[in-house]
Curated annotation (Swiss-Prot):
Record organism: Arabidopsis thaliana (Mouse-ear cress)
An example Gene Ontology biological process: cell division
InterPro entries for the chain: CpcT/CpeT, CpcT/CpeT_sf
CDD domains in the record: CpcT
Name assigned to this protein: Chromophore lyase CRL, chloroplastic
Taxonomy, superkingdom: Eukaryota
Name of encoding gene: CRL
Gene3D superfamilies xrefs: CpcT/CpeT domain (2.40.128.590)
Amino acid sequence: MGTESGSDPESSSNGWSRARGLVVKTLVLIGGALLIKRLTKSTTRRDHARVVSRSLTGEKFTREQASRDPDNYFNIRMLSCPAAEMVDGSEVLYLEQAFWRTPQKPFRQRLYMVKPCPKELKCDVEVSSYAIRDAEEYKNFCDRPKDQRPLPEEVIGDIGEHLTTIHLNCCDRGKRCLYEGSTSPGGFPNSWNGASYCTSDLAVLKNNEIHLWDRGFDENRNQVWGPKEGPYEFKPATSSSINENLSALNILYQSSIDKPIQGSLILQD
């Protein structure tokens, strides 16, 4: 009795299963690689702008730095919160700085506009600062209930003189910062304390820490205001700093004598 010629059906089935499994694995690997590539590319400049805006928002202090180097740095309270949104999606933040003992008396009030860098520029986020037309109306803006603040449309109408613009880029891997940047080399016009122009450096670190270095220079490039040793290091408020701040507020509100703070202010611009 002779044997039949041809392939074994079971062997053919196993071979096809292995081939199909190999194809599926290959497709999964390719799909995974494409997904990772897509996710990597999905972070847009607008996403970066949102991160920077969130990092700037909140209550921060330079308490640690002032304790470490009291001769060169004050303990400053910086408070910022969203105030409006422009038609193009740019976020407008209200920002004020005050000595930690007198948080209700800010010495600096600004509107910051945070938006993605224009396509023609090699940067990720653009941060511009503006004066406020009626700054008195905005004192302690972020501490007030929302129904007691100027309306968003009023905020936009109160955007005053353009002061500075900083272009931020994502920090290289291995650095402490997330974003860093500065004003253009020539800075921006400024006349405070004998200055002819000012510069500003900004770094956004992890945990919403902000390093800000504002300086003024005269026509001969001599620095006439601002810290010389390095930027102010603003760190998010801790429970202890909040308690100290509340104690300071209670003392000030109970006191009928308004004593001026001694010392030269190096943050004004």
